[in-house]
């Protein structure tokens, strides 16, 4: 230690230079750090999506979902497998253990799916990773005062999208509501009859002609060359002029087609049909131009609807790359849009969802809290030291420690987010502690009349004297955060950047206190250090110290009374716990709202549009609504993935009063006017909905769980502290099954697949082919009449052509069987399940959860039905358990560090008695401020373990020193108490002052590092500091009697 201080005092210029370099590097690092809302948390989820056209949910569940589930459920690290089977599609979500490498998991899942046998019509499964980065960071609405939607689409697709995709950090640009150009193809039924053709034969001819087949390498002379057969239909004109063989030429092909039966023969049929075209050209077989039997036209239509404030618009979603800076990407996109607007008259844009705004606001608010906190701390130090030079030396550690922390964080590629900024706000009061203790000791000894040392020797010895207590207190505070890394899961990942920031800042503050502080003290107090001691009263204990000395002496003489009072206060504070209640995280208020509309089964797109328009009108008539933007029919996962689902983004004015009440009222009004599907309020913020209570009901079938789900739903709807209660029970819609009469079919030379093909042509299907126009490929789609059927009779009357050319009604060869089917089939770990969710409106989530659980426990349900909790109640139980274990581990680590530092077990044991009394102030603080015991309050309690122990260390270290000098234990305690009172109070009050802006809960900021954390630390620090000054000396004096060795032999 002597060598370090001597080096610093001899090489002041080198220390100054190093300080300047570190300051500049820290400022540069801080200005160039990525800004995010929360740390990039690993989301251990994979989603497997499979499309199975034309299949009902039950078919999808049996033929696609089940084989996929079986393939992945036993993979390494799989925790839960949840699946939902819809019409035409399957979605399987795999939840892994948090420790799982998700890149490896994706590879393993892909390998497992290679061996799965799926129906021929099912598409290959697609695997995607769930990530917060897969959500848009910007949702934009663009419109034009000058151009129509067609021209605006051209502007957006041809120019704007490419410009936005070119911005660094943009992963994808998703467009909705634009007009899509395609070729529409509709058959002329009378002409088909005239030429003896049917739709299937014509389609096969077109698809068979429009193929490109590589034939491999052929040898020509001495060279090998590739040969390719190309039948590409290049243009719309080519398609119209295409020749189709008429009945006489195609009868053989039709016969072959009809006998082939299954769809697996389709490729052969297409090739055969194409061969007939070639044959007809050489043998003069009669043909007809395609344009004579079908109407082919170039059309422009909007695949999805996008509207903003009642006008047609185009929606644009910006998704950023994983490693990109949200704020930078959003700013660059907005700058590009501003430039595009200047270049295109009439072009307008607005952002309905901007994830950069809350990030910027959180960063600015946290910075302001940090600055105010630093000012409070400086004022408090100045009031105690009453010396400007000493104050300046102390507070230099605040900016320098934080800049060093920023420098290290940037090197580790940790972003500037609410966790790192919150840690700095919290650390401000603590990083100054070491410097205060050192400078206070230098300043105190400098003013002592009987101080034998002067100059460098005094600075060196005064710094050295305090090195052990400040080192052990810093190590203890750092050690408290080590168990957070062991917590694992989302909490662990969320708080690791928080813990690292505090660790780096405190480590930096320790180094500064033994290098820069003694150097500055020697420079600024040169005259005082080299001259005679300053005439002052400081060598005598102050008035406050004398009062404390008398109180401590009384407490030591009346140990039982003092201890009983302290214990009663502790037990009394525990009765506040039920009154305070518990929650996961406090709610975060952004003046935006997201609504989704899920149509009921069988609801048409037109009906869904009417529902959306009614909601739009209600929203536009609301006071304080700034922007209403919605998209419908985009099939967005955010809108539930339904092809006719709608997603609304509503932006309110920033000064909207009672926003929570407004959200509830507007949702109720929209739900009231809707007589079809389901309206829900969603939360797409980075933190999600923190107060959603969920119950899962499992059973063997949906019929088994239906009654139990409805009972739970009723219980939750009757609870006044719950809103937006919904169940995941699937709806049902009518199903018509065409049962083929095989005997009749075989007599007519028909197959069941021909019935399927004829009926399938009425539903959406893959494009027939593609053609080129202006360098772009356009899909050729057969015009369907899906919405135009009045009853199932219309389908029964549809005709198919037999092998002999005879037209047969479908109703003559198949009977219709009426039934019903679920719109979804949901399973979790192989069991059918439905969830019931509700949003808790009360701060006391645990009380609401307990009240509902009590009623659910009384429910009478079948033996094969089970109920499980999820949502916020499961989150609270999980996080509180993990943090409780982290606290126990932190206490064990602290004790170990103290034993090593003091070289014995008794003094550290006495120091630990400062911990229980933090609970008193923490609970009183939460109760008075109206906060709940939440995740951030628990983190505050964890921090207190490190902070309060430091005060006891400073006190007991002085006691041991004085015992070594020959004082009795009582005398040493009284002397140490009066001497160490000022640095203990200074460090405690400086920490409290730094946290006051956080505890006052200024507007904005973060959910995690918020008022609850500030209040917990301030309250706990007040109670523990006051009781530490009495209880720790009492425990130390009692334990001193048990020591076998003489006083003062513990290592100094």
Swiss-Prot record:
Keyword Ribonucleoprotein: no
BP GO annotations: response to antibiotic
Other noteworthy facts: A SwrC-deficient strain is susceptible to acriflavine and ethidium bromide, and showed severer growth inhibition as surfactin concentration increased up to 100ug/ml.
Similarity annotation: Belongs to the resistance-nodulation-cell division (RND) (TC 2.A.6) family.
Molecular-function annotations in GO: xenobiotic transmembrane transporter activity
PANTHER family for this protein: PTHR32063, SWARMING MOTILITY PROTEIN SWRC
Gene3D superfamilies in UniProt: Multidrug efflux transporter AcrB pore domain (3.30.70.1440), Multidrug efflux transporter AcrB pore domain like (3.30.70.1320), Multidrug efflux transporter AcrB TolC docking domain, DN and DC subdomains (3.30.2090.10), Multidrug efflux transporter AcrB transmembrane domain (1.20.1640.10)
Stated name of the protein: Swarming motility protein SwrC
Record has Ubl conjugation as a keyword: no
Position of the signal peptide: none
Induction: Not induced by surfactin.
A Gene Ontology term for the protein's cellular component: plasma membrane
Keywords: Antibiotic resistance
Job of this protein: Required for self-resistance to surfactin, an antimicrobial lipopeptide surfactant produced by B.subtilis. Also required for swarming motility.
